[in-house]
Amino acid sequence: MTAAEPTRADDDTAAPDPAHTKRGSDGERTPEPSGRLDGLKQKCLRHPVLLTTAVAAVAHILWFLFFANSGGDIAAQDAWAEFVGRHPGTAYNLAWYGGMHPVSYSVVSPYLMSLLGVRTTMMIAGTVSAGLTSLILYRVKAVRNPLACSMAGVFAYLCNALSGRVTFGLGMMFAVGATAAVFCWPYRWRYKRWAKAAVAAPLAGLATAGSPVAGLFLGVVAAALFLNKRRPGAYALGLAPVAVVALSAWLFPFSGTQPMSVATLSGPFVFAWLVFFLVPSDWKTVRTASAVYGVGTLATYIVDSQIGSNVSRMAMLFAGIVLLAALPYTTPRSRKWYAVVIAFASLNFWIGFKGVDDIVRTAPTASWTRSLGPLVNQLQKVGAERGRVEVVPPSSHREASALPHSVNLARGWNRQADMKRNPLFYDDTLDPVNYRQWLDRWAVHYVVLPQGDPDYSGARKEAELVGKGLSYLKLIWSNKDWRLFEVDSPVPLADPPATVERAGEGELTIHVKKAGRVLIRVPYSPWLALVDENGKGLERPRETEASKQRADENTPRTFVNENGCLLKVDEDEDGDEWTELLAPRPGTYRLSAPYQFQPGTPCPDELR
């Protein structure tokens, strides 16, 4: 199976069976009715892509009506969509982990999800992806059972929806579109390679902008094409994702680690090599991609990275399709035939079980929808918006989207960021002493313990500690759903001579009593800026005219700092790089992160 093979023609349809035709009065053969089932079958064979798209649409509508909830990955996507909806021009979300760039999650997904709705985006992405996958299967001549393989694809995309991976699904929609541009390019235009690249490369870039994981999977396909000396297709699919990742990492720095256990490794690794050994030997591109993916999966397990367990998604989406496509090439009831059937069945059991498990495990308790109001009311009464609030993460992670508009969360729902900034919840070292140190480090003023099961990773020990009682946590309010604790003598979010008036998700407002340096416990970002009451960035410190006209260029420059500026504090023992305000006078200062041509309000080196 290669990209260079001619594809099925656009109007390639199944010819009617001569046995089911009869000669009309004018001498022409006309189809003889052979039952509604045969008629339906012929229509399906004539329009397999349309049929697949319709089935996928129905499946995703059923998902929306009966299974979509507000927990798990959906909670994170709800949070990002709501954040960019409320603050479309802000580059830094202060309500999660002290501060996170939306772009570090996805470049375009939050904005599209805010515009279309998170669940609507999932339905569109899953449906279009299934249709494009069917198009690829139908157009590649090596696939003898494209309709059956298309239905396997529908099931895989439905399972992805069950797990709530909207951002990934959106990225895969563009990724499959880019792949279709390479593998389904009309044969009569086969020499117009620049036209193919002009279609595939932007889609590959959009795929990576939608989901870096989708861009990684395009890299697997690009590597397979490159190793098989199909360089134009490889460049079209592989260069744009690299550019998008490099640019976003440079402009919006982020680091973190996604965990990956041996159990998580086993699934994608085993199926990568099952595909490699079970598909026909002349499917060079498929076999090379499987080998690259298998080696890459092992490397992801060995080397900590932001990818981690996310690498399994390529096998979950496409291994079943490829295995089913290989089935007609085996002898019925031979050993290889049984191996393909068992592998295909095992793959679908795995992704089906995973989808159902994600729904059950992440379904929010009723308290998150029915009785959230009393908790929010209590948080407002005690002035929780002047510091951070730690909500012990429930299994649904519903707090990540339910509370950021009211208070700043010490955590959120991003496993990579959580493991990077809060390792004590994952390394089995959590105890009353270092928990207090952690509360002080992140300027946590209140702790909320919800009823229900905590997150299986990173919250069980915390829930146990808080539930049993700690000397520095005072229970100030509770009902059957929530327990609210106040931290004794909490560390302020901004050190004296400043006081915090409000810590919002898009803006931090502080009052400074006298000129000087103020340590603010917000992780530094080059986009952080001092803004006016309308959110517009203030002028940076400017060099004086005398300094510009100085005779000796080796003498230090002098600056006028009218509005204040921000410094990155040197990394401390916990790995934190906080923000420091250089305030020229007493008054109110507002920190935000507006998108602007010159990001932030940095202090020049001479003022450090």
Predicted regions and their residues:
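Internal/C-terminal transmembrane anchor helices
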Residues: 334-358
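Membrane-interface junctions at the ends of membrane-embedded or membrane-associated helices
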Residues: 96, 183-196, 227-235, 323-339
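Extracytoplasmic
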Residues: 356-608
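Transmembrane signal-anchor helices characteristic of membrane glycosylation enzymes that use polyprenol
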Residues: 45-72, 247, 347-350
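Membrane-embedded helix bundles of polyisoprenyl
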Residues: 56, 130-131, 135, 145-186, ...
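Start-transfer (signal-anchor) and selected internal transmembrane alpha helices
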Residues: 1-62, 607-608
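Active-site lumenal/periplasmic loops and adjacent helix-entry segments of GT-C-fold
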Residues: 61-148, 152-172, 176, 191, ...
